[in-house]
Curated annotation (Swiss-Prot):
Binds and transactivates the retinoic acid response elements that control expression of the retinoic acid receptor beta 2 and alcohol dehydrogenase 3 genes. Transactivates both the phenobarbital responsive element module of the human CYP2B6 gene and the CYP3A4 xenobiotic response element. Residues 8-83 bind DNA. Belongs to the nuclear hormone receptor family. NR1 subfamily. This is Nuclear receptor subfamily 1 group I member 3. It is found in: Nucleus; Cytoplasm; Cytoplasm, Cytoskeleton. Keywords: Activator, Cytoplasm, Cytoskeleton, DNA-binding, Metal-binding, Nucleus, Phosphoprotein, Receptor, Transcription, Transcription regulation, Zinc, Zinc-finger. The lineage of its organism: Eukaryota, Metazoa, Chordata, Craniata, Vertebrata. The gene is NR1I3. A zinc finger (NR C4-type) spans 11-31, 47-71. Heterodimer of NR1I3 and RXR. Interacts with PSMC4. Interacts with ECT2. Directly interacts with DNAJC7; this complex may also include HSP90. Interacts with CRY1. Interacts with CRY2 in a ligand-dependent manner. The modification Phosphothreonine is found at residue 38. One of its GO terms (biological process) is regulation of transcription by RNA polymerase II. Phosphorylated at Thr-38 by PKC, dephosphorylation of Thr-38 is required for nuclear translocation and activation. The keyword Magnesium does not apply. Composed by a short N-terminal domain followed by the DNA binding, hinge, and ligand binding/dimerization domains.
Length: 348
C-alpha cells in the first residue's frame, strides 16, 4: 500500500514517478511532454467513450483526450508553454551557461608556453624589485625611514630613479632573450620589439608591487609615491594617468601566469616600427592571446570577471599611450636622459 509521502512524489495525472513541477503541476516526464505536444496542436483529441477512460501509468496512452483533460484538471496551464522559438532560445542560453561553467582545459602546448614564460620571469624578474635597495636610495624612500647601512654615499632621487629604470630594462632584455620564440626572430625584429615593449613590460610587472590601499609601489623596503615621480620631474598629469592605470590593473587581481602572458602580448606586437616579419609576430601574439583567454576561462572566476580578457585588451591599448607619453617625459626632464642612455635609446 502506497504511503502518503509516495503519493506526493507521484504524477498527479497518471501516478508514475514525478520529476518536478511542470506547467504548474507535479508530473512525470511523460505527461509533461504529452501536454506540451498536445496543446500545441490546432485540433485537440476527442474521446470515443464520453470522457470516462482510465488514465494510469499503464493506460495513459489509450485515450489522449481523457489524459489531456486530466492534465487540465490537475492544474497544468497552457499559457506556461514556451513557443518553439522561446524554447530554443532558453536551451541555447542553458548550453551557454554550462559552457561557461565548464573549465577550459589548456592544451599541452599552452601549458608549456606558460611554463616557459614563468621560468624566464622567475629567473630574471622574480626578485627584481627587492634589488632596488642596492641602488643607494634616498632615506625618505624607506618604508620605516631606516636606510640599510651602506659604505657608498646616498645619491639624489633622480639618479636613483635613472639607475632602477636602467636595471629594470636590462632585466626585461634578459627575460626576452630567455624565450626561444623570441630568439628565433631576426635580430632586427628583436631590437624593434624590445624598443617598443620594454617600458610596457616594466609597468606590467611593476604592477605586482602596487598597493591599492596606499596608492604606492612597495619594492622590498622601499616605497615610491606619486610625489616622488613629481620630484624627479614628471608632469603631474602624466603621473595621475600612470597611477590610475596601475590601480585599474591591480584591481583585476591577476595571477602570475596572466601577468606574464599579458607581458608576452605586449612584446609580440606586430605593428611596432621597424618590424619586418609581421605575419610571424602576429601569429605569436595570437598564440599568447589565445593562451591567456583559455587560462582565464579555466579559472572559474566570479561572474563579474567574465569580461576580464576584454578589460586587459583595453588596458594594453592604454599602456601603449602611456609608453609614448613616458618617452616624451624622459626626453624633456633636464639631465635625466643623459643618465639613462639605454632607456633613451629605447624611447627614441
Amino acid at each position: 500500500m502506497a504511503s502518503r509521502e509516495d503519493e506526493l512524489r507521484n504524477c498527479v495525472v497518471c501516478g508514475d514517478q514525478a520529476t518536478g513541477y511542470h506547467f504548474n503541476a507535479l508530473t512525470c516526464e511523460g505527461c509533461k511532454g504529452f501536454f506540451r505536444r498536445t496543446v500545441s496542436k490546432s485540433i485537440g483529441p476527442t474521446c470515443p467513450f464520453a470522457g470516462s477512460c482510465e488514465v494510469s501509468k499503464t493506460q495513459r496512452r489509450h485515450c489522449p483526450a481523457c489524459r489531456l483533460q486530466k492534465c487540465l484538471d490537475a492544474g497544468m496551464r497552457k499559457d506556461m508553454i514556451l513557443s518553439a522559438e522561446a524554447l530554443a532560445l532558453r536551451r541555447a542560453k542553458q548550453a551557454q551557461r554550462r559552457a561557461q561553467q565548464t573549465p577550459v582545459q589548456l592544451s599541452k602546448e599552452q601549458e608549456e608556453l606558460i611554463r616557459t614564460l614563468l621560468g624566464a620571469h622567475t629567473r630574471h624578474m622574480g626578485t627584481m624589485f627587492e634589488q632596488f635597495v642596492q641602488f643607494r636610495p634616498p632615506a625618505h624612500l624607506f618604508i620605516h625611514h631606516q636606510p640599510l647601512p651602506t659604505l657608498a654615499p646616498v645619491l639624489p632621487l633622480v639618479t636613483h630613479f635613472a639607475d632602477i629604470n636602467t636595471f629594470m630594462v636590462l632585466q626585461v632584455i634578459k627575460f626576452t632573450k630567455d624565450l626561444p620564440v623570441f630568439r628565433s626572430l631576426p635580430i632586427e625584429d628583436q631590437i624593434s620589439l624590445l624598443k617598443g615593449a620594454a617600458v610596457e613590460i616594466c609597468h606590467i610587472v611593476l604592477n605586482t608591487t602596487f598597493c591599492l590601499q596606499t596608492q604606492n609601489f612597495l619594492c622590498g623596503p622601499l616605497r615610491y609615491t606619486i610625489e616622488d615621480g613629481a620630484r624627479v620631474g614628471f608632469q603631474v598629469e602624466f603621473l595621475e594617468l600612470l597611477f590610475h592605470f596601475h590601480g585599474t590593473l591591480r584591481k583585476l587581481q591577476l595571477q602570475e601566469p596572466e601577468y606574464v602572458l599579458l607581458a608576452a602580448m605586449a612584446l609580440f606586437s606586430p605593428d611596432r616600427p621597424g618590424v619586418t616579419q609581421r605575419d610571424e609576430i602576429d601569429q605569436l601574439q595570437e598564440e599568447m592571446a589565445l593562451t591567456l583567454q583559455s587560462y582565464i576561462k579555466g579559472q572559474q572566476r566570479r561572474p563579474r570577471d567574465r569580461f576580464l580578457y576584454a578589460k586587459l585588451l583595453g588596458l594594453l591599448a592604454e599602456l601603449r599611450s602611456i609608453n609614448e607619453a613616458y618617452g616624451y617625459q624622459i626626453q624633456h626632464i633636464q639631465g635625466l636622459s643623459a643618465m639613462m642612455p639605454l632607456l633613451q635609446e629605447i624611447c627614441s
